[in-house]
């Protein structure tokens, strides 16, 4: 089919690399670093980031449980279109519950999705928070904030877990590359 033709033409196996983790755990940093590294290696890849999609594709959504679900549903549907076209996506989204992760997996397809848990303790995330969102959440200025006033369920069985508290982003990116390249490498 079309996807096989595109994968062969692009010389890669299309996958959705889904980064899940607390706010300020390092998803965007890892996602953009990974995108650059993969582009440098000759892969065709697109970063989809929560902060960006919420300004465009999902600008009509808030942070209620229903809106979070719709946010993930839309992103998963877009990701599926990319994968069906032979393109790799890197998705940096909090995706706080197993239910939402399952929804993404159902839409994208289990074989197409590589789940990465970007792990960092909440104290570390809070210390990194330049926008002061955690502080605002603790004072009640921001409601439904993941990790403070809304739950974050630790992924039960991610394909890979990366700890961003102890290593520099460059080291984390190198580690992720080692894990991901064999999965997306094209073999004729």
Question: What do the PLM-derived regions correspond to, one by one?
Answer:
Residues 1-17:
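Extreme N-terminal, non-catalytic leader segments
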Residues 14-16, 44, 88-90:
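Residue-level preference for the first positions of well-ordered beta-strands
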Residues 27:
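Conserved lysine of the Walker
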């Amino acid at each position: 089919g079309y996807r096989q033709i595109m994968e062969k033409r692009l010389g890669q196996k299309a996958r959705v690399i889904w980064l899940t983790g607390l706010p300020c755990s390092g998803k965007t940093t890892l996602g953009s670093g990974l995108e650059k590294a993969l582009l440098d290696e000759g892969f065709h890849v697109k970063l989809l980031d929560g902060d960006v999609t919420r300004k465009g594709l999902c600008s009509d959504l808030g942070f209620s449980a229903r809106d979070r679900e719709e946010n993930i549903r839309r992103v998963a549907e877009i990701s599926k279109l990319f994968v069906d076209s032979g393109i790799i996506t890197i998705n940096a989204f909090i995706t706080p519950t197993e239910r939402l992760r399952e929804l993404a997996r159902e839409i994208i397809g289990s074989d197409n999705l590589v789940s990465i848990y970007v792990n960092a303790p909440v104290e570390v995330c809070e210390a990194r928070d330049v926008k002061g969102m955690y502080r605002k959440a603790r004072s009640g200025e921001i409601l439904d904030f993941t990790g403070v006033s809304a739950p974050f369920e630790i992924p039960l069985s991610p394909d890979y877990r990366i700890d961003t508290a102890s290593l520099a982003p460059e080291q984390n990116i190198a580690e992720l590359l080692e894990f991901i390249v064999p999965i997306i490498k094209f073999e004729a």
